[in-house]
Amino acid sequence: MFKNYLKIAWKVLLRHKLFTFISLFGISFTLLILVIITSFIDHTVGRETPETRQNRILSVTYFRLSTPKGGNFVGPLVSYYFLDKYVRSLEIPERVTIGNFHKNIITYKDQKKFNFALKYTDGEFWNIYDFKFIEGKGYSTTDVNLVNPVAVITADVRKKYFDDRTALGEYIKLGKKDFRVIGVVDNVSLLRILPYSDVWVPIT
């Protein structure tokens, strides 16, 4: 019985080939879009390296400051001094990290031009986010306090800038300053906007 139904349906579909194609294409395309959107959302908000502790992380990117006279300021432009003194000293958070959104920086080596994403962070950054280190480790709070010119790079940067050789102890020029590489991590997706970068250096 069921086999007969399939034969009848198949003959009907072949009788109107154009409409059959349009219908099947529409259904397939809709399912494809839904799969892509679902995958995008899962990749953006799901627990993936380095954001494996999202249920314990609160990200603050904008502040609202009010004055006794009724003045208000809303924006991200808060100094590191303010964050370090007043936010880091809060009792409720277990850990506090301070950093900026990544910015693009152009550097050169052997007449080759490289365009990398650069991010400034403190030492706690490496304790909060769960990066997978291929080589070395992240810099510490001591490195930040001593303004040590050290850097952590991605595997992609190591491949491009150091020809995929061991990068530990090597120097990478960022702007007019040389930074010693102390760690190499797996590449981070741009969708992970807060931890994302190609190169991380101590915030000063």
Show where each model-derived region lies:
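Juxtamembrane loop-helix boundary motifs flanking transmembrane segments in multi-pass membrane proteins
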Residues: 1-5, 74
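Short, strongly hydrophobic transmembrane alpha-helices
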Residues: 16-44
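Extracytoplasmic/periplasmic beta-strand context in beta-sandwich domains
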Residues: 55-58, 116, 137, 170
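Membrane-proximal extracellular/periplasmic loop immediately following the first transmembrane helix
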Residues: 37-105
